[in-house]
């Protein structure tokens, strides 16, 4: 145990020895302010080069927010922007109030006249044998517009247009042949001819499409022979307007 205490006090004396030497040097030298020049020999090591700057330390914590600054001045007016796209259709608005009556309009142009209806059909209920004269029909079944004259057997065109005519005649058995002519204002358009020996009857027919002016007349004229007529109406004459013309 004794030798351990001896070693302890020797180490302690070696630790304080430089400090005591430095204090002696300091007390013997004049005081000129600051550390004595020779004290660095016992208290400090030799001077060396400055070391390199160490790396930056980690960022510190965020600071406390500052006070709200004053409002700045108004900026200059900006340029007009580009035209935007067309928006969606809006909802239907409420119904507006009824407006006032407008002024009376000008008189309009004449309208299209209604379509004129013209048609007739006549027949022979009795025999007819008056040669070279207009055929007078004893019965008129249809006379729309009343433009067929029952007394004269003639049709008068009320308007200019295109008309259709047809007739069918039965030869009387007492004659061999018969001629019938379709007349237009006194001119023969065409004729119908029927032939058969006596004692026998025969029926012939013909048709025409005529362009008539207003006031023109159309009728049938009897030539040679005789026509058969009874309640069965074998001999007929008919016509109607197809369409008007200017």
UniProtKB/Swiss-Prot annotation:
Residues 113-246 form the C1q domain. Residues 53-110 are annotated as: Disordered. Expressed in colon and small intestine. It comes from Homo sapiens (Human). InterPro entries: C1q_dom (IPR001073), Collagen (IPR008160), Collagen/C1q_domain (IPR050392), Tumour_necrosis_fac-like_dom (IPR008983). One of its GO terms (molecular function) is identical protein binding. Residues 55-64 have a biased composition (Pro residues). The gene is C1QTNF3. This is Complement C1q tumor necrosis factor-related protein 3. GO terms for cellular component: collagen trimer; extracellular exosome; membrane. One of its GO terms (biological process) is negative regulation of gene expression. SUPFAM superfamilies: TNF-like. Residues 65-74 have a biased composition (Low complexity). It is found in: Secreted. PANTHER family: C1Q DOMAIN-CONTAINING PROTEIN, EMILIN ELASTIN MICROFIBRIL INTERFACE-LOCATED PROTEIN ELASTIN MICROFIBRIL INTERFACER.
